[in-house]
Amino acid sequence: MAVAAVRAAAADAAVTFLWVLCVSTLGASTAAVTSYLRIHEGIHYALLVTVSLLSVLLFAFNLLCDALGGASFNPTALAAFHAAGLSSPRHSSLFPLALRFPAQAAGAVGGAMAISELMPEQYKHMLGGPSLKVDLHTGAAAELVLTFVITLAVLWIIVKGPRNPIVKTWMLSISTVCLVLTGAAYTGPSMNPANAFGWAYVNNRHNTWEQFYVYWICPFVGAVLAAWVFRAVFPPPAPKPKAKKA
């Protein structure tokens, strides 16, 4: 069990490193694509490009996570699937989670530091990660609500949504972009404590109460509440009784 937990944590660290490295380029990639296509008017065109790029990224990372045995780049996703009773048996205990959360945070730090060095100078102003733009409690409430909504959407799309993986990925991308736009004036937003911690570390804000309260406690509360709501509406099937041996 300990070996499997360490392997899962290592896979999470690697995937989170790559996720933060790649997803941080979405703004620059959208700007580059719209410039290449000479699309300078209408924000809806830029949003379409962003959703398309995010869909490709999510599809690729879903394949990568599956290949690594269920790796994840978002601590709230692990907590939500655990609370909803949807975790696999080997990932359902608390010990693996206790290893995977800090591993994801460490991977995010590495990804944020790497992209800060690799990003071309003309696009570096697009980096920086989520940051609080309102008072502390308003930001905390916003992060809780946003994480609740995205978690509920993710659970429904993955468990009860369409079977086609491309359609699922497109729906996840649209949901994510809509909530990012909604929360932009509040917290950034993050909806992913590891990603928020990575950028907070780069900007030397990782050891503050704001980081812990707004970007860790409240997203976890929102994710677990969403999981409980999902479990109440869509209860998992009862385990089949084992056949007694004659």
From Swiss-Prot:
Record bears the keyword Transmembrane helix: yes
Motif (NPA 2): 192-194
Record carries keyword Metal-binding: no
Location(s), subcellular: Membrane
Entries under Pfam families matching the protein: MIP (PF00230)
Domain of life assignment: Eukaryota
Membrane-spanning segments: 13-33, 45-65, 95-115, 139-159, 166-186, 214-234
InterPro entries, sorted: Aquaporin-like, MIP, SIP1-1/2-like
Tissue expression from the record: Expressed in roots, leaves and anthers.
One GO CC annotation: membrane
Residue numbers covered by motif NPA 1: 74-76
Molecular-function GO term, any one: water channel activity
Membrane topology: Multi-pass membrane protein
Record keywords, A-Z: Membrane, Repeat, Transmembrane, Transmembrane helix, Transport
Family to which this protein belongs: Belongs to the MIP/aquaporin (TC 1.A.8) family. SIP (TC 1.A.8.10) subfamily.
Protein task: Aquaporins facilitate the transport of water and small neutral solutes across cell membranes.
Recorded domain comment: Aquaporins contain two tandem repeats each containing three membrane-spanning domains and a pore-forming loop with the signature motif Asn-Pro-Ala (NPA).
Name of this protein: Aquaporin SIP1-1
Gene field: SIP1-1
